[in-house]
Regions:
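Nucleic acid-binding interface residues in structured DNA/RNA-binding domains
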Residues: 5, 13-119
Length: 119
């Protein structure tokens, strides 16, 4: 668990930190050239149904993070940022550098989707 150096008063805050760490650990495992959905990450972290929480966790990462946040996408095989925005273009560029092929803004999850333990 992350040591914050402060007295934590609420159990829910500790649980929140633990959940974020689980999510970070799973995202760290996604290999180059593969992607995982928000819901998939939530399920692997023991948080089924909390895909939006995974999205929030990715959104609140520091800009200097080394975590491959861009490998987390929606379950339809596309980027969740609005098409054409700075964030969309950055994520698309990073995925393309790893060999993800976009066709009309999407990519086949059957080809590029990550299955934990299948590396």
């Amino acid at each position: 668990m992350i040591q914050l150096g402060i007295n934590l008063q609420t159990r829910s805050f500790l649980i929140n930190i633990n959940n974020k760490e689980k999510i970070w650990q799973i995202v760290h495992q996604i290999p180059s050239g593969k992607v995982a959905s928000y819901g998939q990450i939530a399920k692997l972290a023991g948080l089924p149904g909390y895909g939006r929480y995974v999205g929030y966790t990715m959104k609140t990462l520091p800009t200097s993070t080394k975590l491959p946040w861009y490998r987390v996408v929606n379950s339809q095989g596309s980027i969740s940022f609005k098409k054409g925005t700075k964030q969309y273009l950055l994520q698309k560029s990073l995925l393309e550098k790893e060999g993800i092929v976009f066709i009309k803004g999407k990519f086949p999850m059957s080809k590029f989707g990550w299955t934990q333990g299948a590396e």
